[in-house]
């Protein structure tokens, strides 16, 4: 089914066509017709399935059909958990709404609230993060929500996980009861919909627990804690043309490894993205990595939910994820839109339980014809490679650089705290190896505490 088959305004259709959106994906085919009829929607769909257009297209059509314009004020609120996801949604919205008269705006933490003060009430559609939106609702006399027709909550489950439940409840106090609500989550959890108290929502789920994309190859490596840096250096150094994402546990760990790999002077361009960066820095990195054909992004789980980085060849999980769901979200950054992708997870003794847990979830399942294509959904041990040991080189770099030494200590301290407070199912064995990790980097544990 194509977008042109929908009874939508020609200006919206033109914006879609101009940006290469011609055929509808499954979630769009199921959601858009019901949303156009005015139904409330509770949808669950994995990231990368096209749910952004599933809520933006009916929103634009609703407001255009009402003759909405500048004098009508705010007609739609789109609330999403992270600044990067808000930026991504706003980019798509701006492009497909190009030929309509609707004004669009973006408000999010990390930018000056004063700069947004007078602009927000001039917008017909606002994309926002929950904390900044509530701040405007409470403090900005220019923002009126009296005419809001549509409320969209994207990645609603993630907002709850991030502690925004009370913030969302406060926001709802400012929104008219008579409105259309579109709620989307990456996973089908009823708890995320309860706060909205919808009377007769349409439930749409295309969440497929039975398997990963058939074009995804998944590998694991069992190793000693101190060998992780050797494996990562070997992979990056041997693959200068790939576009990849490496997931770490903490912001300080991301920063340290970015500084370290800059000094190792490989041919790959290294990008760094974490919650510890300023908003301007995060936006700049996000935009640059999206445009790059190759390069390696070092990030925390900030980059594992919702963000759509095109043509990512490989995902490396440097640290074992806290649970199977996090593993799934991370590997979901590659093998998107029917393209091939590879995933590697580095495990130390005690963390192999992750593989068992994935098996128990039933998400490891071979599909018909996969063997013929040389692709397997099984998570298998990674192919044998000649690993270059750089431990001594890393020690010398850490000792000779005050900045690197400082961030190495911060990384190790925060990593130990992270393991202490995270799920003990995978981390107990790793915590005992922390002293050895200090030795591998040549820093004193006593001075770090």
Swiss-Prot record:
Family according to the record: Belongs to the DEAD box helicase family. DDX10/DBP4 subfamily.
Keyword DNA repair: no
Assembly, per entry: Interacts with the U3 and U14 snoRNAs. Associates with pre-ribosomal complexes.
Compartment(s) where it occurs, according to its Swiss-Prot or TrEMBL record: Nucleus, Nucleolus
EC number: 3.6.4.13
Entry domain remark: The Q motif is unique to and characteristic of the DEAD box family of RNA helicases and controls ATP binding and hydrolysis.
GO molecular function, one term: RNA binding
Enzyme class label: hydrolase
Job of this protein: ATP-dependent RNA helicase required for ribosome biogenesis. Involved in the release of U14 snoRNA in pre-ribosomal complexes. Required for pre-rRNA cleavage at site A2.
Matching Pfam families: DEAD, Helicase_C
Amino acids binding ATP: 45-52
UniProt cross-references to InterPro entries, sorted A to Z: DEAD/DEAH_box_helicase_dom, Helicase_ATP-bd, Helicase_C-like, P-loop_NTPase, RNA-helicase_DEAD-box_CS, RNA_helicase_DEAD_Q_motif
All copies of domain Helicase ATP-binding, residue ranges: 32-206
Motif DEAD box boundaries: 154-157
Name of the protein in question: ATP-dependent RNA helicase DBP4
Main location: nucleus
GO biological process: rRNA processing
UniProt GO cellular component terms: nucleolus
Domain Helicase C-terminal: 228-378
Placement of sequence motif Q motif: 1-29
Catalytic activity: ATP + H2O = ADP + phosphate + H(+)
CDD domains the record matches: SF2_C_DEAD
Organism: Encephalitozoon cuniculi (strain GB-M1)
Keywords, comma-separated and alphabetical: ATP-binding, Helicase, Hydrolase, Nucleotide-binding, Nucleus, Ribosome biogenesis, RNA-binding, rRNA processing
